[in-house]
Amino acid sequence: MRLEAENLAGERGGETIFSHLSFTIGTGQALVVTGPNGSGKSTLLRIICGLLAPEAGEVKLTEGTQIVPVRAACHYLGHQNAMKPALSVRENLLFWQKFNGGEALDIGAALEAVDLAGVEHLPFGYLSTGQKRRVSIAKLLVSHRPLWIVDEPTAGLDKASEARFAELMREHMRQDGMIIAATHIPLGLDGAISTTGNGLVRSLDMAAFSVEDIA
């Protein structure tokens, strides 16, 4: 599987914030997107997964000679956790598992993977900020999608949870998954995966594509 972005431009509020942005990632690879606040990290991720239309350029996901819809192949984890506060943790994850299809881990195993065993019955709204984020990470595990697009995924996590998520990302890559992550802090991926195999972590600094710099 291969994801290509060619000459992308993105805008916010009618103003172009980045342009001439291109990259390619393949099976078992990750792209870590960095840059200052307002540089377009979140806008880029929303364009890639199809939530926003690009101002220019295109995004294409292929498997062999077949074009694959990105929305059908990706998990998107944004700033919001996209969970119903009144529903239990299990009910929320079950909804996303059925909605996304391609069942992977069962809900109990996914919660164990994020060190939240025993909270299935609790309303999501009862959880702490860090626990809510970990449940949202568990959403990535209960149904299989080859491409993870995650925006500040470690927001609200403690150091132990950050390390745990880094290992989940590495495992996803070892299983031929792809990751695009926007972050302002290290995610624990750089240098963690050998570049002699499929695993390869690349970085993209949005500041290099700002309209001010290009002008």
From Swiss-Prot:
It catalyses: heme b(in) + ATP + H2O = heme b(out) + ADP + phosphate + H(+). One of its GO terms (molecular function) is ABC-type heme transporter activity. Its EC number is 7.6.2.5. The gene is ccmA. GO terms for biological process: cytochrome complex assembly. Part of the ABC transporter complex CcmAB involved in the biogenesis of c-type cytochromes; once thought to export heme, this seems not to be the case, but its exact role is uncertain. Responsible for energy coupling to the transport system. Keywords: ATP-binding, Cell inner membrane, Cell membrane, Cytochrome c-type biogenesis, Membrane, Nucleotide-binding, Translocase, Transport. It comes from Brucella melitensis biotype 1 (strain ATCC 23456 / CCUG 17765 / NCTC 10094 / 16M). The complex is composed of two ATP-binding proteins (CcmA) and two transmembrane proteins (CcmB). It comes from the Bacteria. It holds the Pfam family ABC_tran. This is Cytochrome c biogenesis ATP-binding export protein CcmA. It is a peripheral membrane protein. Residues 3-215 form the ABC transporter domain. PANTHER family: ABC TRANSPORTER I FAMILY MEMBER 1 (PTHR43499:SF1). Belongs to the ABC transporter superfamily. CcmA exporter (TC 3.A.1.107) family. One of its GO terms (cellular component) is plasma membrane.
